[in-house]
Swiss-Prot record:
Family: Belongs to the ATPase A chain family.
Organism per entry: Dioscorea elephantipes (Elephant's foot yam)
Name of protein: ATP synthase subunit a, chloroplastic
Lineage, uppermost ranks: Eukaryota, Viridiplantae, Streptophyta, Embryophyta, Tracheophyta
Location(s) in or outside the cell: Plastid, Chloroplast thylakoid membrane
Function: Key component of the proton channel; it plays a direct role in the translocation of protons across the membrane.
Length: 247
């Protein structure tokens, strides 16, 4: 007797899922420019969280750190170790870049799971983690490519381009293609993982709106942190590779 009500409930859940549209966006028209408002809003929130946390934690620095200052010093030490492991002894100038990438992506990813973006109603689309949008991930990957070339040219000058014909000139097209695929792989990997994680949670909440999605949400938090670490590690590895000249 309970089969029909359960079936109706399941169909209703599937109908709700069909209403989830990934491609809807809210745009701001500024002159001739069309600005993707959702990404800007959520990115500003993430930046405000990062800046606010740092200002509060280190507004009264102590010789013996404690509390928030101790936490951020631990984070800085972690980023230094990561940069040194991938880049080598010349890692110092790249710590701010790698740290900025890691912290922004980490907080952006976690904001998708922890902040109630859905409460804010928009005329079109809905708010989500900044890294849930391909525009953000590409915008993060492109500076990594610029840093990659800058590091190589700064270290080796025009001799940097010799790597494209090593070990044989026949590999020139493949070596050039490799440099173009690096930012693509960084951006699509991050975008795909964060989007998939949020969609899985939406589907489970629509079908089983109880405690079942909670383990998936915790798994999403873990995956989000790993994705930030992977992005920062690969960015540092690419920079180190361009400076050392080995593959």
């Amino acid at each position: 007797m309970n089969v029909i009500p359960c079936s109706i409930k399941t169909l209703k859940g599937l109908y709700d899922i069909s209403g989830v549209e990934v491609g809807q966006h809210l745009y701001w028209q500024i002159g001739a420019l069309q600005i993707h408002a959702q990404v800007l809003i959520t990115s500003w929130v993430v930046i405000a969280i990062l800046l606010g946390s740092v200002i509060i934690a280190v507004r009264n620095p102590q010789t013996i750190p404690s509390g928030g200052q101790n936490f951020f010093e631990y984070v800085l030490e972690f980023i230094r170790d990561l940069s040194k492991a991938q880049i080598g002894e010349e890692y110092g100038p790249w710590v701010p870049f790698i740290g900025t990438m890691f912290l922004f992506i980490f907080v952006s990813n976690w904001s998708g799971a922890l902040l109630p973006w859905k409460i804010i109603q928009l005329p079109h689309g809905e708010l989500a983690a900044p890294t849930n949008d391909i525009n953000t991930t590409v915008a993060l990957a492109l500076p990594t490519s610029v840093a990659y070339f800058y590091a190589g040219l700064t270290k080796k000058g025009l001799g940097y381009f010799r790597k494209y014909i090593q070990p044989t000139p026949i590999l020139l097209p493949i070596n050039i293609l490799e440099d173009f695929t690096k930012p693509l792989s960084l951006s699509f990997r991050l975008f795909g993982n964060i989007l998939a994680d949020e969609l899985v949670v939406v589907v489970l909440v629509s079908l089983v709106p109880s405690l079942v999605p909670i383990p998936v949400m915790f798994l999403g938090l873990f995956t989000s942190g790993i994705q930030a670490l992977i992005f920062a590690t690969l960015a540092a590895a690419y920079i180190g590779e361009s400076m050392e000249g080995h593959h």
